[in-house]
Amino acid sequence: MFEIDYRYLRPKKAAAMKKQHEAAYERQETPAVWQGKNATILPVRKIDASGWVGCGGVVDADGHCVDISAVECCVQPWKGTFAQPEYRDEKVVYCGYMIHHWGHFLVEGVTRLWYFLENDPTVDKYVFALDEGEIRQIKGNYRRFLELLKIWDKLEFINRPITYREVIVPEMAFRRWGYYSPKYLDIFNTVAENAAPATRTVGNIYMSRSLLPKHKDVEFGFEALDDFFQKNGYTVVYPERVPLDEMIQYIRNADTVATVSGSLPQNMLFGKQGQKLIIAERCAIIDDWQPPVNRIKELRTTYIDANIPIYTVPMTGPFIMGYNDIVRRYAQDNAMVPPDAHFYSRKYFRSCFVGYMKSYQDLYRYRWFMEEYLLPEMDYHLEAYAYGEEFYREYLNGSRPFRWHHYLEIHYWKQWLKRILKKG
């Protein structure tokens, strides 16, 4: 049975997180399978400005969409027309969309691969759809995952419509809202079992985002958590720099895995049942893919609000994290030592704030970011932003300057004079 420790979340966020972990979630032993002759597998045609959502999937011989070929987050049923498809005299399995995002690859991209483990001898190929017209080399940990599953040599990746003699569409074995099948976990267990043996083991690991290429532009203060966990005996691991085999062994052999919210905790799908997980929350938003992962892996998870939110932002940031009072309370309760004093100094927190404000302006200028999907969660968002406002009050209310041009503004000189007179 999974266990969740909500004590280190802000109260309203803790209540929302608890609600997600306790939502009805069905276990299905065997997902459904659709099978049809002369069906067409389509590439994904992007339909939104962000380039995230598209339409595609499979259509039957009569041109009707096969409902279970859609992908919850990013591939809607096909709309409109497409080019005259090529015909191939082959029986294939539709594997879904080969999404280029590691977290979504794990929770959406591979969810149909359970059918490969059924060992159907009549299948010629397994087919992934790419974006329409996309030329992409599948490499790195994406390719290694498929190699470890032993499916790589049977795969085809298509970027244009192709009609096959026969197409099998396995249902996704995992959906964040609704259900999962044990066959989904079989995929990850197979990959883990085929991974190269561990060359060394460590007791506790912290999976960090601090060396990601985009980190310096949108993520501020994350190094403080690297230092905090390292000083408390954790081995800091940078997943993007570690081969998948090695990463799997790190996770499976760890006593405790700590990491930052987002895609990184979803790597626990490679882990053992019932492992201990610590998630440092990087923003106000709850990553609603993680609760079902915690449930099906029976993880013993502690959430920590290590973030200092300023404005509403999506999961792409910018963010401030660090050794705030919530992390300090967690450290005290668990007899842990703090990070280097530099990481919780006034100067360091100010530098994080300045970086955040520059990043926010670069991304959004003077617009206020808000999407409809955030509205139902606004109570715990307001709670978070009130926390951030209090943390950085003197900068947000205009009492102290933080950008060079502020020193040219009369307002800030007035504030300085008021402080001098008050001290006198």
Tell me the role of every PLM-derived stretch.
Residues 1-413, 420:
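The feature primarily captures lumenal catalytic ectodomains
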